[in-house]
């Protein structure tokens, strides 16, 4: 009987530790390209579940890919994706025109120095908006743990 109580206590403690490790945040992005202005890099790296509302663009997706080191779940169901043209988006090392309401090319896939591509392996789930028209080239390439 004592062993059973000890095992239950250990299991309960493990569940509590796992639950406390999850960090969920919700942000409203008023202007496309300004997501990172809403938090510090340390705060971004702690987030495991992120809900975004408002307006995003390819610059925001680059930050989601490169700076949210523990991001597992991303909910953008109540966000719109604005058109962006420039070199600061997700496409590696070139000027690119990112259409509105499309998941940008290479959104969660980064080109490394040796020209290989690495996906965001922490990402397990993404909830898209009904307004999403298209998923551009290699947006989720290499995201091995992403479930549909």
Q: What do these predicted ranges mean?
A:
Residues 106-107, 136-141:
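Consensus positions within tandem repeat domains that build extended binding/scaffold surfaces
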Residues 34-43, 59-66, 137-139:
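Short, T/G/N/S-enriched strand-turn elements that build extracellular solenoid repeat scaffolds
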